[in-house]
């Protein structure tokens, strides 16, 4: 188990090296960022989706200054149910080093040109970084390698660099101890019926379901 942990740590530190900052770098005098500050976040959403899926959308990864990292557990759900999360706990010093690396790389910058693929109704990926100073955020439309064709070399390079940053964040999460996350609160999203002439619920127009719905043998 220790060997596996060391391998994961090596992957995370290698990710920091790719970003251009040594693994031992820190971004504050005491070596850590504010505990409850969201220091890095990846959010994927939007596009042509049903309202119920829109209501269920939540960030793919959220990193806090104290070393908590929430990441979505990928499964075969269609998005019509709330996402499941894992909670990782890593060294806050490693988190500060990662955030410092991302900031120094400068890729999370609203002035960066990530291009606009010629495709409609796709989602967008938003990345936020917040170390010392003001937060920075970028939004990238249709952020999939299959849509990079047709973009300029510079735009493709910017997208590739941002993917490296996101991969490094997931590698950092893999280093820590991981456990299923149980939320302590819920949010209610009311789609509303103001724009519709139909009532919120409509009587079933067909025959009684008991007459044609049979349990599987």
Predicted regions: what is each one?
Residues 83-104, 162-165:
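Long, charged/polar, surface-exposed segments that mediate recognition or autoinhibition
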């Amino acid at each position: 188990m220790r060997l596996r942990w060391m391998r994961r740590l090596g992957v995370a530190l290698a990710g920091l090296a790719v970003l251009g900052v040594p693994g031992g770098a820190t971004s504050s005098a005491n070596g850590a960022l504010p505990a409850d500050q969201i220091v890095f976040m990846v959010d994927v959403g939007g596009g042509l989706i049903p309202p119920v899926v829109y209501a269920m959308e939540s960030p793919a990864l959220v990193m806090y200054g104290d070393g908590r990292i929430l990441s979505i557990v990928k499964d075969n759900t269609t998005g019509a149910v709330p996402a499941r999360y894992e909670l990782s706990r890593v060294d806050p010093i490693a988190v500060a080093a990662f955030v410092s690396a991302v900031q120094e790389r400068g890729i999370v910058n609203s002035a960066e040109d990530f291009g606009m693929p010629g495709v409609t109704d796709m989602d967008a990926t938003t990345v936020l970084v917040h170390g010392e100073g003001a937060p920075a955020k970028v939004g990238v439309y249709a952020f999939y390698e299959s849509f990079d064709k047709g973009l300029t070399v510079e735009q493709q390079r910017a997208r590739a660099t941002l993917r490296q940053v996101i991969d490094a964040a997931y590698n950092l999460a893999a280093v820590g101890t991981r456990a299923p996350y149980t939320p302590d609160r819920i949010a209610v999203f009311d789609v509303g019926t103001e724009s519709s002439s139909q009532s919120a619920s409509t009587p079933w127009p067909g025959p009684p379901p008991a007459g044609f719905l049979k349990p599987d043998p």
